[in-house]
Amino acid sequence: MVRSFVENEVDPQALQYNREEKFNAGVFNRLGELGLLGVTVNPEYGGSGMDATAACIVHEELSAADPALCLVSCLAHSMLFVNNLDQNGSHEQRLKFLPPACEGTAIAGMCMSEPGAGTDVLGMTTKAVASSDGSSFKIDGAKMWITNGTVDGVTTGDVFLVYARTGPGRQDISMFLVEKARTSSKHSRRGTEGFKLGQKIEGKCGMRASMTAELVFDGVGRENLVGEENGALLCMMRNLEIERVTLAAMGLGIASRRCIEAMNAYGKERKAFGNPINTFGQMQKHIADSYAEYMAGKYYVYGVAADLDLSSAGNGLDADGTKLYCTTMAKNVADRAMQVLGGYGYCDEYQVERLWRDAKLLEIGGGTLEAHHKNMVRDLAKNVVTLP
């Protein structure tokens, strides 16, 4: 079902929306109709009730055609907000916010990075201070590089999970629901005072059909605190694993049907010196290495996903490992595809040019390569085990 949807509805629009740098609300709504925006969420709250493997399949298939759409809808919206709230929110919070997010009538995201804090997430300076009577918090600060922070360059997305410092300790972080005022046929809400768009981020190298922004905050109600005060670090760790494995699956999508299939088809058809170029050793190396690396990554990602428990944090080592391997693999495969296609690969009509640009973000967002190296060596040193 997902592959058919991608071929018929996602693929035809990808080039246009990349060129125009616009968010495709119509395809986003279709994802909601198909149950793909709440793929891991309990059906009680409007989701499809599936597992991490299903989430990886959706990310891989969508990224084969349009990684930017996947980033907007399945990664930022479905994993960073929807899955996060489903695992960490109260029944009342889930009942209020998840149905519109799952059906695609609200667009959501998560706010962690700041202008001065990215990989060092505990270095965030955005603060949430409780009022004297304890009924509300005042959030003061700004978040940067927020996917879905805007969908039109003028207004914000609908609702976000925002991490903010609530105590003096380095780990005293809490998570809050922050929303803009909105009215629809099914859902109306007042919104959070002091929540506004800072700036839309322009001129990105890739993922141009995903909208990225700075968001500014000032004031939020206590009922929008998610989980325990000063307890968001556990929420963060719990959701990082599925985020990283699905980002790795996006790398598989970039490498697979578009880049490897493009190399394979072009190598058979294009002739040089009287022979198909896939008869030359240099081209054979590009194609064969890419296929072998893709298959290795595929088994790694789906093996880890099969054992992933969405309700707990337990396999950070391999969540980091899949993303470390597959994101760099995707960039390298896209680079080889561009090399095999030559001048055609350098033009956006052949799509490998766009995938080449999109792939780079995967090595940065959701944890840099350097952060994965640090995390993995730390975990391996703590738990010296016999490798499988």
What does each of the following model-derived ranges do?
Residues M1-A65, L75, N88-Q93, P100-T105, ...:
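Alpha-helical interface subdomain recognition
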Residues S184-V220:
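Flexible, small-/acidic-enriched active-site or ligand-binding loops
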Residues T126-A130:
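A structural signal for short hydrophobic beta-strand segments in well-ordered beta-sheet cores
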Residues L215-C235:
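Long, acidic (Asp/Glu-rich), low-complexity accessory segments flanking structured domains
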Residues S135-S136, D140-F195:
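A short core secondary-structure module
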Residues G47-M50, T119, H187-R189, V226-N230:
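Cytochrome P450 core scaffold surrounding the K-helix E-X-X-R motif
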Residues G116-T119, T150-G153, R165-G167, G203-M211:
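Short Gly/Pro-enriched turn/cap motifs at secondary-structure boundaries
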Residues P67-N83, C102-A117, A142-F160:
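FAD-binding core of FAD-dependent oxidoreductases
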